[in-house]
């Protein structure tokens, strides 16, 4: 039996916020630019080397079985300096979920909880840079 499902890449990462305007202001300050798409109850940024989408949805629309506290999968965004990014996030009101940890040569991770209860992972990933470079050469 062949696998007919092919995951081709992340298309949108969704966060929730009870105060959408405060979340928009916070993430706009973090990224240094405004969302590229907005509609009532939702806004979206395009980020990084692959222009991944990060959408923030009014928490009124969250599934009824959503956790009340941070939980679930952590999506890690590549950054060039984990410690500096971690400190910036904390200075903006995020709280520590996991301090920076070296996972091996060329791999450092950390994560915070944003002021709206979402886990935001950051990572320096040497493999990510190698893959990105190979894509540029192709």
Where do the protein language model's features map onto the residues?
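Vicinal oxygen chelate
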Residues: 1-10, 34-78, 86-113, 124-138
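Conserved active-site tyrosine of GNAT-family acetyltransferases
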Residues: 23-28, 89, 117
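Short glycine-/small-residue motifs
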Residues: 119-122
